[in-house]
Amino acid sequence: MPRTYVIPDLHGRRDLLDAALLRIETHAGGKEATIVVLGDYVDKGPDSRRVIARLRAGVAPGLRLAMLKGNHDALMVAALRGDVAIANWMTKGGDTALASYGGDVADVPVHDIDWLDGRPLWHMDAHRIYVHAGVDPALPLAQQDPVLLMTKRYADDDASGHDAGEGARHVVHGHDRHADGPLLKQGRSNLDTYAWKTGRLVIGVFDDALPGGPVELIEITAPPAP
């Protein structure tokens, strides 16, 4: 059966993205598959601009790419459109993102801003909901607070998924870093392993025919951030 590969928070680590896409392409072996990227493409790490460029370039034939929006992506858009202070973005890791564009806000292409802003907040298949941070388990997706979808933090012992009139689904998310992760629960999988800092990225592999968590994990390693 087809599989879905999930890449969590990248935060400017183009090296990890390149390695992840190569491993996924090899693992898929020419079969159709979906790649879900959970957002937070920018800030903190050194190559925000090149991460966006790589994702915009697409993937190999037979692979479908679903690229979600994270809170750092939304903050970058808001700062560059004047909705929040640039200084606020800088304190959240935006200094490195801006540096990847040369250090001047005027040099950030509008098409990159528009692309980030256009990312969907969630992706759903028969058995799972993929989202940057999490969901309110009691509300249908159409009624979810967009800010919560990008900023929720579960208690570590919270194993809840989502079952609000649309069928029970496992929630796959990032956002809340666990360097020794991923954190796998009955109702949710948190794949964020603080990859931009540790150099350790874990890709979740999900069988589209089976409910629940990943059937396999693919680990990518690169030098940690200084």
Language-model features: locations:
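Active-site environment of divalent metal-dependent phosphoester hydrolases
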Residues: 11-15, 43-46, 73-77, 123, ...
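N-terminal active-site segment of His-dependent metallophosphoesterases
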Residues: 1-54
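Active-site neighborhood of phospho(di)ester-bond hydrolases with catalytic His/Asp-centered motifs
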Residues: 7-8, 35-39, 66-70, 170-176, ...
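Conserved beta-sheet core of the metallophosphoesterase superfamily
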Residues: 147-220
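Short, well-ordered beta-strand micro-motif
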Residues: 124, 130-132, 203-207
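Beta-strand-turn-beta hairpins that frame and shape the catalytic cleft
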Residues: 1-5, 123-129
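Divalent-metal (often Zn2+) His-rich catalytic cores of metallo-beta-lactamase-fold enzymes
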Residues: 129-130, 134-145
